[in-house]
Amino acid sequence: MGGKNKKNRHGSSTAVQGATAAANRPRAAAEPRPGGEDAAKKQTPRNSNVAPGSKESNKQGPKTYSFASSSDSGVSVNHDKSVLKVVIEAKLEKRIISLINEHKKLNSNKGTVSGRLTSKKLQDLYMALQKLSFKAEHIEEAMTNTVLYGGDLHAALDWLCLNLPDDALPEGFSQQFVEEEQRARAKFQAPPQRPSAANESATEKGEEGASLKGNPELTMKEWILRYAEQGSDDDDDDDDVKEEEKETTLEKFDPNERYLELTAKLLDARAQATATKQDKDKQGQKEAQERIRGYQQEMKSLEDHPLFNPAVKIPEVKSESKQPKPALPPSEDEPLNFNLFEKKENAPEEKAKKKPPLDIRNFDYTSRSWTGKSPKQFLIDWCRKHYSKSPNPSFEKVPVGKYWKSRVKIIKSHDDVMCVCPTIVTEDSMQAQHLAATLALYELTKGQSVHQLLPPTYRNVWLEWSDAEKQVQEQNKTESNKPRDQFITKLLNKLKVQQNQLKSCSQTQMMEDPEDSWENLACDEEQHETCPSPLLPDDLEPIRNIFRKSRDSMKYKRLLNDREQLPVFARGNFILETLKRHRVIVVAGETGSGKSTQVPQFLLEDLLFNGGSPGKCNIVCTQPRRISAMSLATRVCEELGCDSGPGGKNSLCGYQIRMESRTGEATRLLYCTTGILLRKLQEDSMLKNISHIIVDEVHERTVQSDFLLIILREILHKRSDLHLVLMSATVDCEKFSSYFTHCPIIRISGRTFPVEVFHLEDVVEATGFVLEQDSEYCQKFLEDEEEITLSVTGKGGSSKKYQEFIPAQSGTGLDLGARYQRYSSQTRHAVLYMNPNKINLDLILELLVFLDISPEYRNVEGAVLIFLPGLADIQQLYDILSSDKRFHDRRRYKLIALHSILSSQDQAEAFILPPAGTRKIVLATNIAETGITIPDVVFVIDAGRTKENRYHESSQMSSLVETFISKASALQRQGRAGRVRNGYCFRLYTRERFESFMEYSVPEILRVPLEELCLHIMKCDLGSPEDFLSKALDPPQLQVISNAMSLLRKIGACELSQPKLTPLGQHLAALPVNVKIGKMLIFGAIFGCLDAVATLAATMTEKSPFVTPIGEKDRADLAKSSMAVANSDHVTIFRAYLGWKAIRPEGYAAEMSYCRKNFLNRKALLTIEDVKQELIRLVRAAGFECPRSVEANGLSSAMKALSAEETSLLKAILTAGLYDNVGKILFTKSVDITEKLACIVETAQGKAQVHPSSVNRDLQIYGWLLYQEKVKYSKVFLRETTLISPFPVLLFGGDIAVQHRERLLTVDDWIHFQAPVKIAVIFKELRILIESVLKQKLENPKMSLKDDMILNIIKELIKTER
């Protein structure tokens, strides 16, 4: 074989160029590197010369670890101010990392290792980390600490980012946040340029040696480095060269220059090894030895290169490089001698002895065996073709004793000369020239099959060189990968041992008895306290005695007369007889028939005196509303003659609602809300203590009532002694009957007076209302036009036809049908063009005036009830009536607005009878249909519109949609006018419109989210929610159920693999609130601020205490703004509540003054207080005790203002409960600083606007808003919002993803924060710590968390963020 010399004008070292190119190249994870085995240590171009090696690397490269780019995320970190930065204090960061590592040590056996883990997978993981430029020792440590415990590539990467110091992290993983600027690199000051003429290799090296000898102060190391750096003047100028020039540079690899560079590095490594040995630094010695071994292995491979020149070898290095193992560092008394030439002179005989023998060969061939070109001629022809402007190759004979070698010089260009000389000698000088030509072709045509065009003898030596080069590469590859392979083998053995140990442990555990679950550890007393069960089976004789005494009382006898006047009383015996023959019946009674009070009494009396068996006289009557349960129980107690009221000592009737229970030992008839009965089902799935269940108002089709019907139908199949009565106020009874196998229907007429009904056409005709063409209630798109065809005749008799729309002549209106012929043209015009989707307030005003001036109605005593769809319509009509002079006389008119958001004082006046001669006008929504009864209503004005809460699958949000009412609702509204006398109903829609109405409204189960319902299904072990709800009266869509289950899994209430509740889900099912609010309550208890969080939860489940009186909206908004704090509606409400609590001890007058000043509803505040106490009781009953000391360290008491730290903690818990209801504020900079722009927020489903009632309605800042609900009116609005910081989202939000190179931290793929990788990993690990604490607490609710280090450090972290 032979050696090669090359020179060019730049003289740059190929190795240095390769290293520079690798450093300047962007570090993309998917970029293949030559060799692919040890890219972190060896990025030399040595392997790039070998095509087969490169191909093998590309085909069998490791799995890549991909990093998303900024373009993928759509975020420019350094320029987008909306991407907030996340920073943790340095001291706190160290403490958190220490806590994370300590927790991992204590829980190191929790990981599950895959049984299919192979050495190939471990090798892929190792190489993936290696490609990210992590050091081998760090990779091994990371894999040892993660793979053994079930970790993968991401776990190993997280471990590295968390535990390595910042200066040990590769580029792109640095902790520094500042944008790195491009720095100008200092150029190497080159020595005087050498002559460009090509000199022979030996002569050139001899000159270098002479130069060295002439300067005794110049050490061998300096000479080596100088040799390697010669011609590197313009290294930096080559950064922008084209790709093809880079490839050409890599092809010009000179093993001699690389050998010298490695020699210098080897000497450095030895010096470092000596120093570390003196310092007794074992780790440093190990690292130095590894480097020495690597340098020697590569130097040995270079010595076998065909172009290697032995003259560059140093005797000391050469002798040691032949040793199979790296030499140990020299001892202290034998310092390293860098004057290698002096040693060389002192031992000439030793050098002569080590001179290798000559390789003598004969390459003779006959003209018969080869008729083609000779190698020399082939080389000349090849150079003429490829270097046409250069002279032919020149051959120089080199005598070696009696043998010959030949040196061939090829001038590729004026600054690029190639000179090669084989080490093989021949007896013939011509054969030597052919051999030199063959070697030159071998170097010039890498990867080509040129050897097939050469004579056989030279073809064989070509193949010999090629095989030797491949063998060296393979050996080098094996040697370089040997430490990695040894480590992987050891790690795999450890994994196998660990798996065997786990199998033996699991078998042992299976033999042991399992521990009781958290459910079995619950206290019986607490369960009874949470869900009292008043209906206890016992002897009925004492109950009969009580009933007999009650029937003898004067109150019972007096009210019996009133009961006998009710329509249902006459059907009492028939109802009882039918129920004895059938276990299920449907009672259809109109409003006022008395079914809700009388049917339960019929059953009670019959069970007590006509065959009721002991323990089987327990009647439960469900109501959809709390006020209905309370009022009905009170009325029934009076009719039964009980003086003590519901739940009294001798009372047979009681009630139970969410926050109140009035029952006693004698209670045998219980009125309760539907939700209470559902919670009883969680304790007793068969309702064994109940004999009769009455479900009232089933026509309302609430979610709870439909759910209850599914369960009751299942129970009826299993219990033959249970009876069910369904009571409805409408005629929609066939559907209920068919659902329960066509059970009997008993119809009862109501006790109502006749009601005369007028439709839109009658109202317009009677009032003489004129619909102006420019009125806002006139449909502009239905202009009085008609289509005509015009025929236009042109020149030459040609004609063209045009279609035009022209105003129609008066009297040519469309025919509305025969029923409208008796109405005037003015009425027909109004009916035709009036917009049916907009309530005509002008017409309502005219109608009220008509009722006052018409002789037929003027003297009719009674109130006017106007049904409107929402608060905005109520307020608008209220303003119109208040500003009209005709209604200024307070002695004649009393105007009342009735809505749940308005003050209770106005609503209370609706139930008070006004003085004679005063007409009461009540503006209300559909709450007045069945929820409340205004006793003196005679006139009803029905706008025919309502607002329904509907769930939109596309946007996954609920919205209030204004729509037409159903026929059932229209009849209910009509019936309100016939309670006391003959009434009148004015419908602001035509008769045709009424006939087109749906018979009934869409059931609520088809319109709302189903999370709470799914919780109850799983809590009661009723199977899969999808399967269970398919049995409903109207089954919801599977996608809606799937969305509900997805949310439950996201908040951790349900297991991922099966419909089974987690400990968190078990507790959420016991809390009568939305699942997100329930989670917030539990987090509040765990973090020691249950009182404050329960207050916020109460405001979310009820209504805001802030009120807006009619005509005082501006003042009310100003009062709320003055109380605003922390850019949060929730904290503002809490502040108002704290102020009210502080002022209460001063008396009622001070309390009312505070409420009036701040536009607060005192009743709402009292309700919030009651609900808060109930929620706290429920949470504590589940075992989440919150001692006073913990509360004191959490949030302030009611008498104290909130601090900034406490506000941060409260916001964090709000985020834990309400996430993923978050949105990004779209900051808009206003030109006019006085202008207030609406706050627009980008949510996961699209843009939305903060509701005008929020304190953040005009907030303009970079940040994120948490919102309680998203509703759709004319726009999509966010109600009850709070500005939150990054920490709560990162701690309690969705899945975290890290974009290392961009320093981006992403939550749920759309929420972005700027953060170094280490901080990102910290938050990922904190999530694991939080989950571990929650799991322990939820499985053992009585466990104290007062001194828990994890919770304390998380609270400290939250409170440090501003």
Swiss-Prot record:
One of its GO terms (cellular component) is eukaryotic 43S preinitiation complex. Residues 28-41, 243-257 have a biased composition (Basic and acidic residues). Its EC number is 3.6.4.13. ATP-binding RNA helicase involved in translation initiation. Part of the 43S pre-initiation complex that is required for efficient initiation on mRNAs of higher eukaryotes with structured 5'-UTRs by promoting efficient NTPase-dependent 48S complex formation. Specifically binds to the 40S ribosome near the mRNA entrance. Does not possess a processive helicase activity. Residues 1-10 have a biased composition (Basic residues). It comes from Xenopus laevis (African clawed frog). InterPro entries: DEAD-box_helicase_OB_fold, DEAD/DEAH_box_helicase_dom, DHX29, DNA/RNA_helicase_DEAH_CS, DSRM_DHX29, HA2_WH, Helicase-assoc_dom, Helicase_ATP-bd. Residues 18-27, 66-76 have a biased composition (Low complexity). Belongs to the DEAD box helicase family. DEAH subfamily. The keyword Cytoplasm applies. This is ATP-dependent RNA helicase dhx29. GO terms for biological process: positive regulation of translational initiation. Part of the 43S pre-initiation complex (PIC). It is an enzyme of class 3 (hydrolase). Residues 576-749 form the Helicase ATP-binding domain.
